[in-house]
Curated annotation (Swiss-Prot):
The gene is ZNF296. A zinc finger (C2H2-type) spans 157-180, 231-253, 259-281, 386-408, 414-436, 445-468. It comes from Homo sapiens. GO terms for molecular function: DNA-binding transcription factor activity; RNA polymerase II cis-regulatory region sequence-specific DNA binding; sequence-specific double-stranded DNA binding; zinc ion binding. This is Zinc finger protein 296. It comes from the Eukaryota. The lineage of its organism: Eukaryota, Metazoa, Chordata, Craniata, Vertebrata. GO terms for biological process: negative regulation of dendrite development; negative regulation of transcription by RNA polymerase II; regulation of transcription by RNA polymerase II; spermatogenesis.
Length: 475
């Protein structure tokens, strides 16, 4: 340590000049700055990840922003700057993460598409999309002041299923998709469901939708090998096997009956039903007097038997006759075992004989009346069958056809002599008579009020409770 005298001024020491002025270096900050040569190619660093220096931009900026050089690098860092880029960006592979990007891609922003006018809206303008749908697909001209104020007022979006609230529309949609399993995206293969059509619209479009062209263009007809989807009725959602069946099925909703009869007002929806109906218009061939006399002689000579002898088994009457014609057709045919059920047509052919109660109940009278009124056809017990003039159903014998006709006409020729029961078949009447104890050797219980016999005491008690409740209560 040097000593100096008191009162003496300090001496300034000038720094010694450098030996080589070309190699001078600033020693105050100890900063090293290396500049690449203009002719030399910058050294390329090896890839440190999936992103190259050209693909990844500097941290905190995106493409298109100006790049600012960080300036001189401290010497203590001991890193070489490769070109004009920051070496720290090689270790930071940043990917832009916009709030309105889809979870599986970062190339296209999410858009809301109107299914009617195919207009698209950004996800951030979801309120404008709602207004667009409410106002009937009006053009979107950007958020206005009213829309901006509405977005400011809409501070929270609530899930209607769980009640959870969100402040961003995209988070609400993502919650609906991930937490509740709702599909908020539409793929290319999907198509929006067609709205249900009214009956008038279906009637107008059914010929164009399921016409012959649709059958010709089907995958099965073209031989492409593709499985064809079964057609479905747009009204009742019923699945049909073919488009032709769907076309016929649609007529049940629209009331269309394109097949009309040329002899009567009958109309139907299928051609097969019309062909079946036309068989009912076949007229009965007139019977010769010789055949009529022969049949009457055979009927008088033959013993009385309860078999069916149809005067004209295949004869049917025109549709204009209505229910009266059907009843008349059934009155001339007898059922096997029926206690007298035949009445022949008069000379005019319009009036038919009626069966009285005595003829139904008295077997002797019925056996005497049946040979006189019912001619036999060739001595056969059963005549050939025919088709029903009401529904077209075919029967092999006339007895079944006769019983079937009564289901259309409502005729019940067999009545009980003890009560008001009536039926269309004799077998049902015999079964009913057993309830009254009409079988040989059975015990009868007679009602003290109406004197109706019964075969069982329990049946009589039931009769008293239903028909005479006052007497049953007193007993």
């Amino acid at each position: 340590m040097s000593r100096r005298k008191a009162g003496s001024a300090p001496r300034r020491v000038e720094p010694a000049p450098a030996a080589n002025p070309d190699d001078e270096m600033e020693m105050q900050d100890l900063v090293i700055e290396l500049k690449p040569e203009p002719d030399a190619q910058p050294q390329q660093a090896p890839r440190l990840g999936p992103f190259s220096p050209k693909e990844v931009s500097s941290a905190g900026r995106f493409g298109g922003e100006p790049h600012h050089s960080p300036g001189p690098m401290p010497a203590g860092a001991a890193l070489l700057a490769l070109g004009p880029r920051n070496p720290w960006t090689l270790w930071t592979p940043l990917t832009p993460n916009y709030p309105d990007r889809q979870p599986w891609t970062d190339k296209h922003p999410d858009l809301l598409t109107c299914g009617r006018c195919l207009q698209t809206f950004p996800l951030e303008a979801i309120t404008a999309f709602m207004d667009h749908k409410k106002l009937g697909c009006q053009l979107f001209r950007g958020p206005s002041r009213g829309q901006g104020s509405e977005r400011e007022e809409l501070k929270a979006l609530s899930c209607l299923r769980c009640g959870k609230q969100f402040t961003v529309a995209w988070k609400l949609l993502r919650h609906a998709q991930w937490d509740h399993g709702l599909s908020i995206y539409q793929t290319e293969s999907e198509a929006p469901e067609a709205p249900l059509l009214g009956l008038a619209e279906v009637a107008a479009a059914v010929s164009a939708v399921v016409g012959p062209a649709a059958e010709a263009k089907s995958p099965r007809a073209s031989g492409s090998g593709l499985t064809r989807r079964s057609p479905t009725c747009p009204v009742c959602k019923k699945t049909l096997s073919s488009f032709s069946n769907l076309k016929v099925h649609m007529r049940s909703h629209t009331g269309e009956r394109p097949y009309a009869c040329d002899q009567c007002p009958y109309a139907c929806a299928q051609s097969s039903k019309l062909n079946r109906h036309k068989k009912t218009h076949r007229q009965v061939p007139p019977q010769s007097p010789l055949m009529a006399d022969t049949s009457q002689e055979q009927a008088s000579a033959a013993p009385p038997e309860p078999a069916v002898h149809a005067a004209a088994p295949t004869s049917t009457l025109p549709c204009s006759g209505g229910e009266g014609a059907g009843a008349a057709a059934t009155a001339g045919v007898q059922e096997p075992g029926a206690p007298g059920s035949g009445a022949q047509a008069g000379p005019g052919g319009d009036t038919w004989g009626a069966i009285t109660t005595e003829q139904r109940t008295d077997p002797a009278n019925s056996q005497k009346a049946s040979p006189k009124k019912m001619p036999k056809s060739g001595g056969k017990s059963r005549g050939p069958g025919g088709s029903c003039e009401f529904c077209g159903k075919h029967f092999t014998n006339s007895s079944n056809l006769t019983v079937h006709r009564r289901s259309h006409t409502g005729e019940r020729p067999y009545t009980c002599e003890f009560c008001n029961y009536a039926c269309a078949q004799s077998s049902k009447l015999n079964r009913h008579r057993r309830m009254h104890g009409m079988t040989p050797g059975s015990t009868r219980f007679e009602c003290p009020h109406c004197h109706v016999p019964f075969g069982l005491r329990a049946t009589l008690d039931k009769h008293l409770r239903q028909k005479h409740p006052e007497a049953a209560g007193e007993a």
